[in-house]
Amino acid sequence: MKRQDISENQAKIVYLGIGSNLGDRKKNIEIAKSHLSENNLDFLSISSFYETPSWPDPKKPKFLNVVIKAKFCFDPESLLKICKKIEILLGRKKGKKNDPRICDIDIIDFNKKVLKVKNKLTLPHKFMHKRNFVLIPFFEIQKEWHHPIIKKILKA
């Protein structure tokens, strides 16, 4: 008989960043949010929409970004699969790094877990503390957050 870890199925607090810089950006984000909700994410808070220059090339179309705080009962890899599936469903094409895209869903934090799966997933998001397009909407819904790697409290 396999013994299951009880904490495995308990809800974890996760933060996701959703961005779009192609097509109807707001509609793309709303559709992504709807699909996330249908995939066992229980939204607790959603930031306002923030328009930001494309990074690292501000000549590319501007991004619209939001951050979501949610509860999720499964593991980080399951959440990553859901995010990638939604990006593809919305029409994201595999292109060069930082190319314009219809939908980009990033896991910013997964229950303060520190994880590195080579070329696949790093938690917390390795650049989250350096990017205003993440931090500004993040701080709208979470006034401070302890970064488990750099050991600093990030504040609005």
Each model region followed by its residue ranges:
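A structural signal for short, well-ordered beta-strand segments
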Residues: 18, 46, 66-68, 105-109
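Flexible, gly/pro- and Lys/Arg-enriched active-site loops
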Residues: 54-63, 72-81, 85-156
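Active-site loop/short helix in cyclic nucleotide turnover domains
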Residues: 24
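Extreme N-terminal starter segment of soluble prokaryotic enzymes
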Residues: 11-15
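Short, surface-exposed acidic-centric catalytic microdomains
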Residues: 27-75
